[in-house]
Amino acid sequence: YDGLKQDFFSINVNLFVASYRGYGNGIGTPTIINSLHDSENIFDYFKKVLSDKNANGPIIIMGKAIGSLSALYIASHHNEEISGIITESSFSGPKYCAEISGVELTQDQQNELENFSHELCNSITSPALLIHGEADFMIPITEAQNLFDLLSSKAKDIITIPEADHGNLVILGEEYYWWAIEEFIYTHCNISPY
């Protein structure tokens, strides 16, 4: 996010970025359970940082790809504490993550993950913005549509970036991408862009 922080600052928001075990600068083994556990600890730490700094502004949770699962998990457990959730190149739950990782699942495991995904997404009532590339073959756009359909949020939107794939979403959709995020933040955080 180093390359994007100026873009976030230009729309008058602060940015808190975290890495998970086995991703970015995080050490350890990346697993679905670890990332969900880590997301709760990270959110608790984030709230402590805000409290220590006497910062009490609105909170938007954002996650990309595998990070979207952690963002969904936080949103599902903290609807009242956040102003919204933004996902980028997201999927509707851990079942898809297991499938693309090549993990063999029994029918019972598939059913359990499917139920977990539905419960997770159905419990989210915070406003939601989903951003996805139309040419994303790593996580097909149908996954974002499934997620959109599962969310209980009354205020939700999905935007797609034509010709964008998993890695070039921000580059190809730059103006539309930032406009959508800006509008979402200003609408759901009750702040003015000026």
Listing of model-derived features with the role each one plays in the protein:
Residues Y1-D7:
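The serine-hydrolase catalytic nucleophile loop
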Residues T29-D52:
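Alpha/beta-hydrolase active-site loop
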Residues S70-S126:
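Hydrolase active-site cap/lid region
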Residues S123-T125, L130-H132, D136:
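Short beta-strand/loop motif that positions the catalytic acidic residue
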Residues A135-I139, H166-N168:
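Acidic catalytic loop of the alpha/beta-hydrolase fold
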